[in-house]
Amino acid sequence: MEFQGNSFGGTLLILEDGNIAVNGGGTLADMEKAYIIDGEEPMAMIVSCEHHHRSRNVDRFCLKHNVPLITTTLCANQLALEGVNVILLTVPESKLFVKSGFGISLTPVQYDSAEPFFLTVNDGHEQIGIVPDGKIYPDLAKYLFDCDTVILGNCLEIHGNAPSALARRLQSVYNTWEELDEIFKNYDGELYYI
């Protein structure tokens, strides 16, 4: 299994039997460029939270390309998804999509969204973990240690004169580089910070 990051913070998982898009956030054109490879549309899109930087234009993309959207009930309730084929999961939950050849597991994470989670995707050969947002601790990270690859998008470095209230809020829902380095110091797989 391979992956590609993109300019708007999403990830495309490239599986043997098809691709999975993780999160929107870009313009429709940006999402099409990032998620449609050689004319092949993704077999599904996973949206990890309702925040604009993750959910922007997912409805338009999924409707235009007839791509099912996988998310949680609480996240879906926050989005305008009329007409979109939505597959609802709860946190924590694991679901095997036999026909498409992949399984997904959702694990709760500390973040300021309706039902935050990180996910692992297994294609029967490899397992990849993605933490788009949220603060993780060693007790949660253990669920990622069985993954061949882990992609961390929950890294934060506060620069300059951020107001103290903003800095505290961000530090409560994101990890620093140092925290993540410590948490994953004994991880044997491939680790990517995006």
Where are these regions (language model features)?
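Conserved beta-strand hairpin/beta-sheet module of binuclear metal-dependent hydrolase folds
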Residues: 1-37, 117-133, 149
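Active-site neighborhood of phospho(di)ester-bond hydrolases with catalytic His/Asp-centered motifs
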Residues: 21-25, 42-51, 69-73, 129-134, ...
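Short, acidic/turn-prone active-site loops that include or flank metal/cofactor-
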Residues: 26-27, 74-76, 91-96, 134-136, ...
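Active-site metal-binding motif and surrounding structural segment of the metallo-beta-lactamase
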Residues: 27-71, 146-148
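Glycine/small-residue-rich loop that forms an oxyanion/phosphate-binding "nest" at active or ligand-binding sites
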Residues: 51, 55-113
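Structural motif corresponding to alpha-helix initiation and N-cap regions
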Residues: 55, 134-138, 177
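Catalytic core of the metallo-beta-lactamase
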Residues: 95-149
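Cap/insert and terminal regions of metallo-dependent hydrolase folds
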Residues: 139-194
